[in-house]
Amino acid sequence: LWSLEEPNLYRAVTALEADGKAVDRDSTTFGIRTVRFDADKGFFLNGKPVKIKGTCNHQDHAGVGAAIPDRIQAYRIERLKWMGCNGCRTSHNPPTPEFLDACDRLGMVVMDETRMMSSCPEGLSELERLIKRDRNHPSVVIWSLANEEPEQGNTRGARIVSTMKKLQRKLDPSRVVTT
């Protein structure tokens, strides 16, 4: 199983053939684990209670801005693990695939946050692409649909989030959401 201490990963290879010839091939890395949230008892990973000790990670780094090299992504997760962290939130922006790859390899749970709270076609398309891209990452345990949005906490915002949650549930019913 994939865990914080032993982040076991596997690779599935999918090949598409036509007339007996390989026409396409793709490889997907994944981990196997169970996740449960209990209102009274907290977070459980593989049936064991885990206290999430995390940080909010912004997509920027001194000297390189938002274009963080893969090695620095991994270095940041390694340092967080060394500090005793086991979780992080990708603040205000979706994470890069390389960031999630590092979290998968190093055993760090992630709250994967979308860029904006929106039920317009563009916003829902962005959310769909995010979920489809990131749903095989065992590190991702929560989808964050909104943060510091002007519509949070009012009737219009509730309608927007309801639409977003319906799409999230259709694409990935295995994870919880937060707004």
Regions found by a protein language model. Give the residues of each.
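Active-site groove signature of glycoside hydrolases
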Residues: 127-157
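Charge-dense, low-complexity intrinsically disordered segments
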Residues: 67, 117, 155
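Short, acidic/turn-prone active-site loops that include or flank metal/cofactor-
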Residues: 114-120
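A generic secondary-structure signal
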Residues: 79, 129-133, 167
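Active-site neighborhood of divalent metal-dependent phosphoester/pyrophosphate hydrolases
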Residues: 109-111, 147-148
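Extracytoplasmic/secreted cell-surface and envelope-processing proteins
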Residues: 98-99, 119, 152-154
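A short, flexible beta-alpha/helix-coil linker loop
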Residues: 57-62, 117, 148-151
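Secreted/periplasmic carbohydrate-active enzymes, especially glycoside hydrolases
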Residues: 1-92, 97-102, 106-110, 125-126, ...
